[in-house]
Amino acid sequence: MLNFRVSGEGKTIVFLHGFLESLTMWDYLPLEQLGSRNIFIDLPGHGKSPLTDNSEHASLEFMADEVIAVLAHLEVTEFSLVGHSMGAYVGLILKQKLESCNLLVLLNSNFWCDNEQKKIDRLRVVKIVLKAKNIFINEAIPNLFWKPELHKDEIKKLKDEALKMSSEAIAYATLAMRDRKDFSKEINQTPSGYVLIHGVYDKLVSISDLESRINSLTQLNIITNAGHMSHIENSEEIMEVLSKIF
């Protein structure tokens, strides 16, 4: 079973971290202020969770099924979910599979599949990671921040944590993201079931790209002075938005 941590009491909110991260990413936010039962989970191959998929094809569906096993173990009957980046990709699958998932909050993420160029880039990452993961990690993590020079300590901590991952786990997650499905139809048909939170300076997904793909009814919250790591770069605004949602 995946590694998890539970804190607080009240309505259940599940938190899923992003690529190269772990459940410790949520420590940057005072989530106890939400007055909820918070469940934090390490996705397969990340943090303290092993990667146990022996199939030939990497998939986010496998990650989602592993999360479902944790929720069943904890006897969760109804919940909301907050997913950061890759965690939201897994969340999209869970939202589709489980009627018990009332709301999905996509934090610095998107809901469409990779284009052909992005798929090529993912394969390039896999080749680099399998040869020298430290090169990839040292380049990738600072680029997630709007102003990396302001977050040297946090970047070092993130790098150290990512370096503990096996090259195989990083490659697996990369390939799983490469082959993910497009959920544009689901989000635009039922906008009340989804909320987007996004850093205005996110280099991975632009605000204009998001705005061009969403229904006018879909709630998009833009975080100022933040890139892809808005929970670190502007935790105060993130908490303001989460407090309004929950």
Over which residues does each language-model region extend?
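Conserved loop-alpha-helix segment in the C-terminal half of the alpha/beta-hydrolase fold
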Residues: 191-226, 232
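Active-site loop/oxyanion-hole signature of alpha/beta-hydrolase fold enzymes
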Residues: 30, 37-82, 93, 240
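Flexible "cap/lid" loop of the alpha/beta hydrolase fold
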Residues: 89-133, 137
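Conserved alpha/beta-hydrolase "nucleophile elbow" surrounding the catalytic nucleophile
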Residues: 17-19, 79, 83-85, 199
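Conserved alpha/beta-hydrolase catalytic His-Asp/Glu region
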Residues: 114-120, 131-189
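Conserved HGGG/HGGXW glycine-rich cap/lid loop of the alpha/beta-hydrolase fold
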Residues: 2-53
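Post-His helix in hydrolase/transferase enzymes
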Residues: 232-244
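Alpha/beta-hydrolase fold catalytic core
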Residues: 1-13, 33-37, 72, 76-77, ...
